[in-house]
Amino acid sequence: LTPNTLSDLNSK
């Protein structure tokens, strides 16, 4: 998983 994916999930 990329940092962007983790950020996206955390954002929601």
Curated annotation (Swiss-Prot):
GO terms for molecular function: glycosyltransferase activity. Keywords: Cell wall, Glycosyltransferase, Secreted, Transferase. GO terms for cellular component: extracellular region. It is found in: Secreted, Cell wall. Its EC number is 2.4.-.-. It comes from the Eukaryota. Belongs to the UDP-glycosyltransferase family. This is Putative glycosyltransferase. It comes from Taxus baccata.
